[in-house]
Every structure is written in structure tokens, then in C-alpha cells.
Design a protein with these regions (language model features):
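Cytochrome P450
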Residues: 1-221
Length: 221
């Protein structure tokens, strides 16, 4: 899909840098601020809105509804919460459908326009498929980006010598990012629930039993 080739992704760097610079400028003169809510949490959604050329007046509205979809991955979500999320999703789809059709008729340089022209097995994506992909893009980098930025800053303050090293040599940024991913990985654990009786390494699980898989332990051996 041309919208997601390495070259297309690389071209998003100026957009990301512009969004990050703007968010940092907003908090630079404040005596104190919340790094998570005012910077880290906003970066992925703001970047995605920029890439999609989403109207400014609808960005916060769309982000609130789409990001709520991440709750569907929670094994403890209630039926009432599912119903509420379904209403929000329907509102987003209703709003985005004419926007997608307009971009298909008059494509620009934004990601949404790219999706309207993308071919899979020789066929264009349907409007429904485009909206589903946009929602997936909003969700995919949210919690991971927010958590990695927040955890990385915490670790830098815990290790001021490493902070000073990174400040003195910005070329270490890529290596630092890789180390943060290892040391404070954004997905620490996964919850799984047995759909039926099963035995794994002599451990018996009955239907409904829940297990926590601690992925972070692999990076701390």
C-alpha cells in the first residue's frame, strides 16, 4: 500500500517534529506542567490529525471517541461500556464518511487522500475500509507512544549522568530510544483468558481462568 511505504513514512518526520515543537513551546514558559497529559499523550493524536489533514475544530472530538476504542481490548470491559463505545464509533463513522468521499473525489497530499487511492490486490479500499484503517492508525500508536515518552523522561531524571550524556551528544538519540524500549518497554504484560480447559507446561487452566503474561521480564534477565 503506497500510503505506508518506507519513503511515505519517512516523509512524516517534518510533521512529527513540527507537532512536538509546538507542544513543547506551549509548556516551555510554564512553572509546572503535566508531561503526560500536556505533551506525551497529545503527540500521537496530534500527529495523526496533521497527517490526515483533519479539520482543527473536530480533532479533539474525534480523538476522544476513537481513543475510547482501546477499552475494547480490556477483558474486564462491561456490556454497558461496549454499548457506549459503539455509539461513539458510529458518530465518528457518520462524520468521516462524507470526508473520505470528498478526499477520494479531490485527493490532496495527506494520508487520508493516500488511503483513498491505495490499491490492495488491484482494488481500491472501500470507504468503510478506509475509516477502519484510520481508526486503527489512531489507536495503534497512542498508549505505546505516551508510555515510552513518559517512562523515558522518568528514567533520565533517575539517571542524570545519562541525561547529560544524551544532551551532550544528540547523535545517541537512536541508541537511547532502543534502550528505552528495552528497559521500560511500553507493553509490560498481557492478560489472557482461557476459552476452555487447557494444560500448558503441566499447569492446568479451566474455562474463564485468567493469566498475566509478563513480557517485561524478558528484557531484565
Amino acid at each position: 500500500m503506497a500510503a505506508f511505504t518506507p519513503r511515505a513514512v519517512e516523509q512524516t518526520q517534518p510533521t512529527i517534529e513540527r507537532v512536538v515543537a509546538r507542544l513543547l513551546d506551549e509548556v516551555a514558559e510554564l512553572d509546572e506542567f503535566d508531561l503526560v497529559s500536556q505533551v506525551a499523550q497529545r503527540i500521537p493524536s496530534e500527529v495523526m490529525c496533521e497527517m490526515l489533514a483533519f479539520p482543527l475544530e473536530r480533532r479533539e472530538w474525534a480523538a476522544e471517541r476513537v481513543l475510547g476504542m482501546s477499552r475494547t481490548l480490556d477483558p474486564d470491559i462491561t456490556p454497558a461500556e461496549v454499548d457506549a463505545l459503539a455509539v461513539g464509533l458510529a458518530e465518528v463513522e457518520e462524520y468521516m464518511l462524507p470526508v473520505v468521499r470528498e478526499r477520494r473525489a479531490n485527493p490532496g497530499d495527506d494520508l487520508m487522500s493516500g488511503l483513498t487511492q491505495a490499491m490492495v490486490d488491484g482494488e481500491l479500499l472501500t470507504d468503510t475500509e478506509i475509516i477502519a484503517n484510520i481508526i486503527l492508525l489512531f489507536l495503534a500508536g497512542q498508549s505505546t507512544t505516551r508510555s515510552l515518552i513518559s517512562n523515558a523522561v522518568v528514567e533520565l531524571f533517575r539517571h542524570p549522568d545519562q541525561m547529560e550524556l544524551l544532551r551532550s551528544d544528540p547523535t545517541l538519540d537512536r541508541a537511547a530510544a532502543e534502550e528505552f524500549l528495552r528497559f521500560v518497554g511500553t507493553i509490560q504484560m498481557l492478560s489472557k483468558r482461557a476459552l476452555g480447559p487447557v494444560t500448558i507446561d503441566d499447569v492446568k487452566f479451566e474455562e474463564g481462568d485468567q493469566a498475566m503474561i509478563v513480557l517485561a521480564s524478558a528484557n531484565r534477565d
